[in-house]
Amino acid sequence: MGSREEELRFILHDLGVGPYFLGTFDKHFPGFISKDRMSCAIVNTAGRETGGVHWLAMAWHPASQTFYMFDPFGFSDQKLKQIYNFEYQGLLKRSALTSTADRCLTLIQSTQSVQGPNSAACGLFCCMFLHAFVRWPLRAMDNNPTMNLIHGVPNNMLESPSSQNVFLRNQQNLYRFLRRHSPHFVKHAAQIEADTAFDKMLTN
């Protein structure tokens, strides 16, 4: 099942992301329309009519002209298009960010996998990343107290048996992090953990 949109919004409010959060969107997300406002969003790789497939987090930091694209699986744009028919480069072209004075911006994309291949916790990992973004926007992807709680492996090792213990520890640390910071998660922990379980895709 994974995470519901309303649930992600409640958790992000608890994490202090609310003032910067534009909302949850399907693959038709129009982009960051205001180039002068620090903002972020959680975007699904599928259309809303499908019920959703995989959550990504996107964030814009105008002071440094930095666009973040966080995928818990660490897929490249080419791989996202191949698997989900989703392109973030196309999203960038639709966005007002390309109308900046010199059209010069820095794209920082996650390239390592932090989520197991059968886990349904992608939305929760996105919440964790956005917590880091609003606090440390210049080093949101790593080298901060939030993202240091999880560890990545090269995307080509996503299915490797040697990676699964790393992913399991990441998900356990993710739940621990949310228990500390989100009253909504604490109140609904049993249901949320069942919906986003490490082996959820095997049991569907």
From Swiss-Prot:
Compartment(s) of residence: Virion; Host nucleus
Site entry (Cleavage), positions: G51, G52
Taken from the UniProt entry, a GO cellular component term is: virion component
Q: Quote the EC number.
A: 3.4.22.39
Reaction(s) catalysed by this chain's protein: Cleaves proteins of the adenovirus and its host cell at two consensus sites: -Yaa-Xaa-Gly-Gly-|-Xaa- and -Yaa-Xaa-Gly-Xaa-|-Gly- (in which Yaa is Met, Ile or Leu, and Xaa is any amino acid)
One Pfam annotation reads Peptidase_C5
The lineage's top-level taxon is: Viruses
Q: Name one GO biological process term.
A: proteolysis
The annotated active site, in chain numbering, is H54, D71, C122
Alphabetized UniProt keyword annotations: Autocatalytic cleavage, Disulfide bond, DNA-binding, Host nucleus, Hydrolase, Late protein, Protease, Thiol protease, Virion
Other notes? All late proteins expressed from the major late promoter are produced by alternative splicing and alternative polyadenylation of the same gene giving rise to non-overlapping ORFs. A leader sequence is present in the N-terminus of all these mRNAs and is recognized by the viral shutoff protein to provide expression although conventional translation via ribosome scanning from the cap has been shut off in the host cell.
Query: Which family does the record claim for this protein?
Result: Belongs to the peptidase C5 family.
The entry's protein name is: Protease
Organism of provenance: Bovine adenovirus B serotype 3
Q: Which gene encodes it?
A: L3
